[in-house]
């Protein structure tokens, strides 16, 4: 075989070998991905009110090579069931856990007992009980902002009805207490109503108290209030916290006067990022408070508010 023919045969083989080496061993994003991390997410409820937060979590999981497993109490907002779920995940040696606490007092012992398991709470801060980190918002500022918004529609001495829809020690209650303090300081009458989805009982409260405004402090209660207000011309002005598609539609139609739209997509993303870095013993410098904005019908289509109301991945 001539040297020329030999070179014609060997050179392509060398080229293919080099190409294979580049594809198999050259630096690239997929070759620098960390090992897959399993992460359990213990929710407060199973409806669509955490959908945007869940999208944020799923986007972070995709970016950071994390596999999420969502766990939901059979009864919405059951701290007792959350304790059981948390203890089960810890005993099963879950590498990392996200928890949206329903009640700090009920969950405190289980959180403290989590030990070496990476545990990050979302919405309600439990670092004082031993959680590794918390992704939350300034609940006092949020509650005060809602109270201030409601004051615009309620004259001095007028009554504002606050919905207590999530009993227990949690971030949602912090919002309610902050709104109550501000409204009372500014001369408004405040009534607190324990919301139980009983529309008949609520209608009686409206008839007796005759509030000028109602404030809901989490998305589930605000969604139900918006539905109750449908077609009711005499319904009080409605304010609340939440930014689901249903709430945005109610705001657009005027059934909700103003909302505190929280960047829950960002909260979900940051929670997974924090837990992943801590579980992998990577550097994590903490996260700033999750932002929110008071949004009215006339401001809902500004570019900044669009990102809060209609987050996209």
Regions found by a protein language model. Name each.
Residues 8-24:
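Hydrophobic membrane-insertion alpha-helices, especially the h-region
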Residues 25-53, 132-133, 159-167:
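Short beta-strand segments enriched in small/hydrophobic residues
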Residues 38-56, 60, 69-79, 102-104:
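Extracytoplasmic "Venus flytrap"
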Residues 49-64, 142-146, 170-189, 224, ...:
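Short, solvent-exposed amphipathic alpha-helices that sit
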Residues 99-115, 194-248:
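Hydrophobic alpha-helical
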Residues 104-141, 244-252:
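Flexible loop/hinge segments that line or gate small-molecule binding clefts
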Residues 134-159, 243-247, 262-280:
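Hydrophobic alpha-helical segments within soluble ligand-binding/sensing domains
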Residues 266, 270-313:
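Hinge/cleft segment of the Venus flytrap/periplasmic-binding protein
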